[in-house]
UniProtKB/Swiss-Prot annotation:
Residues 47-54, 121-133, 218-237, 293-309 are cytoplasmic. The keyword Metal-binding does not apply. GO terms for cellular component: plasma membrane. This is Olfactory receptor 5AK2. It is found in: Cell membrane. Odorant receptor. InterPro entries: GPCR_Rhodpsn (IPR000276), GPCR_Rhodpsn_7TM (IPR017452), Olfact_rcpt (IPR000725). It comes from Homo sapiens. The chain crosses the membrane at residues 26-46, 55-75, 100-120, 134-154, 197-217, 238-258, 272-292.
Length: 309
């Protein structure tokens, strides 16, 4: 990357939350607690699934990968955000900026596909129960998870590669708390039409495709549940889907808010707030959502609690 006078860009200055700098101590403690809770919760989910034989099913296979992805993408942005509360100048080397976005974009995209797969799993279980073991075999599920990581890697690599080819002549101050593509494009003096097009195409296609998979899966699930004659069967099916549906609603609701904002100064600040929720709060909520509404998880946690205390 070069500036307009051919001076090489070696670092970026992350503006973060300059307007709230007087509350840095409170914000630091709050987001540190959220981050620690997120890491412990998701690590606990992974550990529980891999050590308890009751969780050796395909549903939990997807869940442990979702927990892993949540750990990775929140760890890509939260530590640097915490640093912005304690340092007056939050500088980041160009190489670090590239790595940060590459990791974040890879796992954030993978998260979308994993949530979509976790909608397909109950669809097959409820709508096609006799064919579940054939359609959702372990080999198929491994390929689906691998595909989610591949899609994440492709999206991140393309976005990063085209962003690295830009020249900068305006400033090296990024109006964000981490290195995201839109605020970086705003600093470029190169033609960014291709970059914007790629951003819209990749982000749009990933969100639309995974969103449609989730929507149609739940349309068929709800239609099948409503046809059930047994009220107990309907209640059990609704309970099976409730946790995932809650997580999906929060996830896509936040993304919709982020990308439907107008490009004003106020919307940039609102975008930061939305990104905080998306990048730090949602990874913390997912373990709570899936454990609090899951009897097997709650029973396993009670057993562990009795052993420890």
């Amino acid at each position: 990357m070069t500036l307009g006078n051919s001076t090489e860009v070696t670092e970026f200055y992350l503006l973060g939350f300059g307007a709230q700098h007087e509350f840095w101590c409170i914000l630091f403690i709050v987001f540190l607690l959220i981050y620690v809770t997120s890491i412990m919760g998701n690590s606990g989910i992974i550990l529980l699934i891999n050590t308890d034989s009751r969780f050796q099913t395909l549903t939990y296979f997807f869940l442990q990968h979702l927990a892993f992805v949540d750990i990775c993408y929140t760890s890509a942005i939260t530590p640097k955000m915490l640093q912005s509360f304690t340092e007056e100048k939050n500088l980041m080397l160009f190489q670090g900026c590239v790595i940060q976005f590459l990791v974040y974009a890879t796992f954030a995209t993978s998260d979308c596909y994993l949530l979509a797969m976790m909608a397909v799993d109950p669809y097959v279980a409820i709508c096609k129960p006799l064919h579940y073991t054939v359609i959702m075999s372990r080999t198929v599920c491994i390929r689906l998870v691998a595909g989610s990581y591949i899609m994440g890697s492709i999206n991140a690599s393309v976005q990063t590669g085209f962003t690295c080819s830009l020249s900068f002549c305006k400033s090296n101050s990024i109006n964000h708390f981490f290195c995201d593509v839109p605020p970086i494009l705003a600093l470029s003096c190169s033609n960014v039409d291709i970059n914007i097009m790629l951003l819209v195409v990749f982000v749009g296609s990933n969100l639309i495709f995974t969103g449609l998979v989730v929507i149609f899966s739940y349309i068929y699930i709800m239609a099948t549940i409503l046809k059930m004659s047994s009220s107990a069967g309907r209640k059990k099916s609704f309970s099976t889907c409730a946790s995932h549906l809650t997580a999906v609603t929060i996830f896509y609701g936040t993304l919709s808010y982020m990308y439907l904002q107008s490009h004003s100064n106020n919307s940039q600040e609102n975008m930061k707030v939305a990104f905080i929720f998306y990048g730090t709060v949602i990874p913390m909520l997912n373990p709570l959502i899936y454990s609090l509404r899951n009897k097997e998880v709650k029973e396993a946690l009670k057993v562990i609690g009795k052993k420890l205390f």
